[in-house]
Amino acid sequence: MNIKATINLTDTMLNKSIIDANKSVCELAKEFSFDYSEHEAGDKNAVSCRYPDGNIAKVTFYKAKTRGDKRISITKLKHYAQAGDVVTLKQSKEAIEILIND
């Protein structure tokens, strides 16, 4: 089954690189052995990902060190997206495909 997560980007998400993990992100994280409900603050899991142009990056599912908020980090995102865009993370074998406004 192909799991997808969608994120509606805001200025804060892009400029501070802090993205809250919504319900769809939490479901996708489980497919990569990271269940937010079973992890403690500071825990993280990095997964290889790919942009449509073939560029390799990294998606990190993590719980913030201080309060344990559920978060996700996507490297190189500023180069591909801007505030108002919708980012789709799509499960693809052992990696994640990153799609912008798809």
Positions of the model-derived regions?
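Acidic, low-complexity intrinsically disordered regions
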Residues: M1-D102
